[in-house]
Amino acid sequence: MQLIDGKSLAHKVQENVAKEVEELKQVKNIVPGLAVLLIGDDPASHAYVNMKAKACERVGFYSITHNMPDTISQDEIIATIEMMNANPRIDGILVQLPLPKHIDTNKILEVIDPKKDVDGFHAYNVGRLVTGLDSFVACTPLGVMKMFEEYEIDLEGKDVCVVGASNIVGKPMASLLLNANATVTITHIFTKDLKAHTSQADIVVVGVGVPGLIKEDMVKEGAIVIDIGINRIEDGSLVGDVDFKNVAPKCSYITPVPGGVGPMTIAMLLSNTLKSAKQRA
């Protein structure tokens, strides 16, 4: 069993981004810029945004965070996004999810200029991904693909089970795998027999937010398991969606939680923002 070390890979990605940022500054006098919209006072969202701001600083980005109260109107959010769309210093716009209940998330995401949609959530970019065209791709699935690449895991012809069909993780993950010529099964809350699908798969990718959902008897010997789940349990520790202790010995590769997929998400956000800045150049 080999651990896939997301922490060290994310560090490597960030180092490469920092080098390219320095070159972009020297040659084109361009500093990549990321704007983040943070609405309300959800502690987890604030923690994520702080991590993103620190990462931007480390690689030499310009970054700005718009903190807004959860009483804000949809029109005010739209006006702020439109202002950032028009700002030439901003290459990436990120709206921290989830949004308050009175806000239509899809409508907000659709206002973002697709060329600045570094989270890859705009329908334009989703459509390009599905059809196999170059696009901005959601950062977590993109991070998983980077892991496969780094560890030289060949996806062609592999049976892959994606557990979870969210717009943010499951669906883009399935599209990326399909584009890499894997045979993809997507399971979700209405799937009758989850084990029947996961136990046949060469690779299981899970991201549903249910601690310990994937048990030892649900994966085959030698499988590759990618755990995207991050759950804080009663004793305060972070665990994934996989029963790591019992599943890991059966795997050829597995990602730990924490230190697996999580760090890759921010690394790929930086990578996407750099990509946008280079298009500006």
Curated annotation (Swiss-Prot):
Alphabetically ordered keywords of this record: Amino-acid biosynthesis, Histidine biosynthesis, Hydrolase, Methionine biosynthesis, Multifunctional enzyme, NADP, One-carbon metabolism, Oxidoreductase, Purine biosynthesis
One protein family per Pfam: THF_DHG_CYH
InterPro entries xrefs: Aminoacid_DH-like_N_sf, NAD(P)-bd_dom_sf, THF_DH/CycHdrlase, THF_DH/CycHdrlase_cat_dom, THF_DH/CycHdrlase_CS, THF_DH/CycHdrlase_NAD-bd_dom
Reactions accelerated catalytically: (6R)-5,10-methylene-5,6,7,8-tetrahydrofolate + NADP(+) = (6R)-5,10-methenyltetrahydrofolate + NADPH; (6R)-5,10-methenyltetrahydrofolate + H2O = (6R)-10-formyltetrahydrofolate + H(+)
Highest taxon, organism lineage: Bacteria
Pathway, per record: One-carbon metabolism; tetrahydrofolate interconversion
Alphabetized SUPFAM superfamilies for the sequence: Aminoacid dehydrogenase-like, N-terminal domain, NAD(P)-binding Rossmann-fold domains
Cellular component aspect of the GO annotation: cytosol
Signal peptide (UniProt feature, chain positions): none
EC number of this enzyme: 1.5.1.5, 3.5.4.9
GO biological process: L-histidine biosynthetic process; methionine biosynthetic process; purine nucleotide biosynthetic process; tetrahydrofolate interconversion
Binding residues for NADP(+): 164-166, 189, 230
GO molecular function per UniProt: methenyltetrahydrofolate cyclohydrolase activity; methylenetetrahydrofolate dehydrogenase (NADP+) activity
Function as written in the Swiss-Prot or TrEMBL entry: Catalyzes the oxidation of 5,10-methylenetetrahydrofolate to 5,10-methenyltetrahydrofolate and then the hydrolysis of 5,10-methenyltetrahydrofolate to 10-formyltetrahydrofolate.
Family, similarity comment: Belongs to the tetrahydrofolate dehydrogenase/cyclohydrolase family.
Subunit structure: Homodimer.
Name of this protein: Bifunctional protein FolD
Lineage: Bacteria, Pseudomonadati, Campylobacterota, Epsilonproteobacteria, Campylobacterales
